[in-house]
Amino acid sequence: MPLANPQLTKFTTASPVLATFSFQELTSGQSFLSLFPMRQEDSSSIKNSLVSQILISNPLATGSSAATGSFTKIIDLDFDALINQNFDIAGNAKVNLVHGARSYSPSRTAEYYTIVKVRRWDGSTETDLGSVQTVTHTYASGAGSNFFSWKQESLDISLSESRINTGEFLRVTFEVWAKQGSNSVNIVIVHDPDNNVTGVDDNSQVINMTDGGTITWPSKTIINIPLKIDI
């Protein structure tokens, strides 16, 4: 419909987006993107994802037997999030994770640690942005059997400033390294956004997040990615 006054120009562009920031974001120049690693199993495969929603992971955990002798990488998991909007990463990522060990017989020992890596992946090439290694934990099953021993980690990862472009992936990798004595010990890392107390791992072994009947540990892993804000 034409305007009554020909000196007026019809407004044809959308109104500008109004961005709001918290005091912490304004003073630090960064915000955090909270992501949860999870696995989804169907009839043909298991898919690993980084999600922002509280979903159930199936399996709840991933486990593997430690190697005898020297430290060997026994678990190597990549969790990906497809990026649909360019953003810049700068600062320290914050990670909470739980990993542990279990044996089905008494008097078994093992040592283990986990390395967490944050990467950019374009579908063919990985670019490492930062990594951190947990302390090395020692497990001893004592006189009992089927005994879990869980360890909770709170970690910082210093990240190289980097832009993640539309169509690329933000990738978080978990490497579990372990060694055992002369008998088998299973090392487990959990990744359930819904934080369930019981479930199964990728070998259909029952997972119980209660340690010795006194403490119930979280089964979710959280990665807080620092995003640079241009204000």
Predicted segment positions?
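Proprotein-processing/basic-patch segments
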Residues: M1-N92, N96-R108, S162, F169-I231
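Aromatic- and Gly/Pro-enriched, solvent-exposed loop/edge beta-strand patches characteristic
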Residues: T109-N183
